[in-house]
């Protein structure tokens, strides 16, 4: 019987735990404050930012919005980040991506104080993950590890295949699985005989940005399949990188889209916000 991994349920549990940790800090006179920076008026970005603000409100985290016009220059954005870095009342800084053309995203990410980098994108935090030190970890991969652990899915000793090598998901995902003692293979657009590789996977994480690309022929019986993708099909319905109906019956566990990995990303962002404060107060 296939287990449908419920990201909404687990994300709610994590947000409740974060809420308790925030309350404990408040009892000691310590607030948690996240600065949310949005440049331009991209509708999808506005939705994501609003969802993050709602999660902050639920968890008792203060959120401060900095909504800048599309015409904002890179220098102006970097100046704001510098001010937020130096503001002791700000614990976390989130710059909503993508940024308008003409602004170097890497430069902006690198300008954020690593201790306030709640997205976990700064090279210092990525490096800490690489060498096994404590740091703020990219939210989506961290959320996937939480899903696996809370569903008692063993990673140690398992063949883990990650499809996709992005800095936001693929690479940190591989490092986190390695940290949990999985045997990890990363596939990408130049991988030969992709099916031969994916059919070895006990745990298959798919983050390639192609709707319903992975069907049942890519998956071995009893595998755990984690779908990171999110798209709208021709009918306007949400779907992932995995063809859920084709794959589901072959798996022992699978994340749906929506309601799988997506909610975990915001829950782990909230976790990083409170961790940024706890790391300073220890």
What are these regions (language model features)?
Residues 32-40:
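Short beta-strand segments enriched in small/hydrophobic residues
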Residues 41-53, 101, 135-224, 233, ...:
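Glycine-rich phosphate/diphosphate-binding loop of Rossmann-like nucleotide-binding domains
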Residues 76-88:
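Short, well-structured alpha-helical segments in soluble
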Residues 56-70, 184-186:
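Short beta-strand elements in bilobed, periplasmic/extracellular small-molecule ligand-binding domains
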Residues 95-155:
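Anion-binding alpha/beta catalytic cores of soluble intermediary-metabolism enzymes, centered on
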Residues 1-30:
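Positively charged, low-complexity intrinsically disordered leader regions
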């Amino acid at each position: 019987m296939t287990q449908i991994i419920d990201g909404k349920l687990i994300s709610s549990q994590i947000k409740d735990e974060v809420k308790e940790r925030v309350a404990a800090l408040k009892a000691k006179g310590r607030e948690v404050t996240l600065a949310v920076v949005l440049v331009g008026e991209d509708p999808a970005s506005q939705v994501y930012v609003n969802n993050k603000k709602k999660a902050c409100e639920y968890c008792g985290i203060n959120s401060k919005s900095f909504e800048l016009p599309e015409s904002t220059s890179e220098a102006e954005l970097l100046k704001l980040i510098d001010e937020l870095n130096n503001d002791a009342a700000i614990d976390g800084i989130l710059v909503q991506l993508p940024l308008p053309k003409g602004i170097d995203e890497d430069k902006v990410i690198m300008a954020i104080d690593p201790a306030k980098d709640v997205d976990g994108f700064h090279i210092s935090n990525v490096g800490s993950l690489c060498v096994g030190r404590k740091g703020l970890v990219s939210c989506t991969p961290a959320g996937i590890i939480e899903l696996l652990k809370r569903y008692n899915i063993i990673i140690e000793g398992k063949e883990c295949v990650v499809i996709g090598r992005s800095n936001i998901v693929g690479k940190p995902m591989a490092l986190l699985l390695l940290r949990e003692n999985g045997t990890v293979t990363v596939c990408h657009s130049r991988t030969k005989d992709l099916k031969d590789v994916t059919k070895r996977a006990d745990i298959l994480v798919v983050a390639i940005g192609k709707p319903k690309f992975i069907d049942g022929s890519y998956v071995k019986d009893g595998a755990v399949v984690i779908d990171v993708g999110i798209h709208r099909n021709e009918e306007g319905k949400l779907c992932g990188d995995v063809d859920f109906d084709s794959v589901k019956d072959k798996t022992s566990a699978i994340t749906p889209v929506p309601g799988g990995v997506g909610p975990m990303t915001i829950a782990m962002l909230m976790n990083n916000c409170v961790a940024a404060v706890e790391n300073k107060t220890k």
